[in-house]
């Protein structure tokens, strides 16, 4: 979404001074690869903070690329401990437009933060659907 709207990426975050390696270790099993890798700080009052209700949460980390410059119209929702953008949304969007860098779908039923995110997405889908006419 960031690139499509005019933003840019770091192609190899691990090679950027000041950033740690966000890639998974392929020698580990899937549970370990997708396990919590680091914490992210949620922007107070932001969409993600309102959904989760906490200042920070642990997330998995399996990515080599990362946001470099955020596109105009996007808002940072969370950052990693090294300052890398881990989540963003579209400012003043009429619907649910949250992008995250981690994999909240992994073992979702065991992760209350992921459950809250997907619950908010589902509620937004239902709200959108309720505004549309149904075929007769």
Where are these regions (language model features)?
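Amide-donor transfer/coupling interface in amidating biosynthetic enzymes
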Residues: 14, 18-136
């Amino acid at each position: 979404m960031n690139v499509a709207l005019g933003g840019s990426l770091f192609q190899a975050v691990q090679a950027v001074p000041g950033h740690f390696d966000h890639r998974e270790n392929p020698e580990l099993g899937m549970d370990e690869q997708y396990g919590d890798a680091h914490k992210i700080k949620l922007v107070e009052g932001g969409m993600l903070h309102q959904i989760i209700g906490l200042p920070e949460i642990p997330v998995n980390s399996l990515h080599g690329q990362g946001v470099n410059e955020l596109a105009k119209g996007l808002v940072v929702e969370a950052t990693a401990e090294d300052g890398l953008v881990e989540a963003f949304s579209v400012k003043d969007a009429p619907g649910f437009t949250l992008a995250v860098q981690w994999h909240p779908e992994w073992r979702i039923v065991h992760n209350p933060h992921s459950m809250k995110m997907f619950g908010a997405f589902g509620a937004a889908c239902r709200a959108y659907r309720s505004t549309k006419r149904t075929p007769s």
